[in-house]
Amino acid sequence: MSNIRRLPFTFLMACSLVAQAAAPQGWFMAGNKPADYETGVDAQAGLNGRPSASLKSKKPAIEGFGTLMQEFKAEQYLGKRVRFSGFVKSEGVQNWAGLWMRVDKGKKTVAFDNMQSRPIKGTTGWQNYEVVLDVPQDATGIFFGILLDGIGSVWLNSANFEIVPTSIPTTGGEPPLPNGPKNLDFSEIR
């Protein structure tokens, strides 16, 4: 293989390693533009002076997203309802940010929520957020994290993953279909 052909692969690997070097232990960077974001741990930036993870854009404009995430086997959560939660603060988020979680069966996603319907935008103080999903009996993997679409900065503190009772509603999935047609005369305006 020529040096020119190796260059793109080597460059991508170097970018990936740089991004991974700053990620907190047990976490990694991903997304469709992970090289456009940086992550790290702010030792005393969290609630009560506790460490928090940060995810920040590195460019003045980004068409895409980055995420700081974890993944693990679903085995011990099969048939359970689970919640990923944490306190998040944001600064200058122009598109949106949010916690997210996905449950897969093989290569197929069977449950998903990324808070896009209730996004974090702009500059906010610490607020508690959560995503809650059911893990089917045949699930194989669980993935979760914090994502930033476009530019800005977000911090995650006091992250928690737990089994919850079914009395706590899920946050993911498609909204239920209405019982019939609506607004056929277009008189209702958002």
Predicted regions and their residues:
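Positively charged n-region of N-terminal signal peptides that target proteins for export
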Residues: 1-6
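Bacterial N-terminal signal peptides
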Residues: 8-18
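Extracellular and organelle-lumenal recognition/adhesion modules and their flexible linkers in secreted
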Residues: 20-190
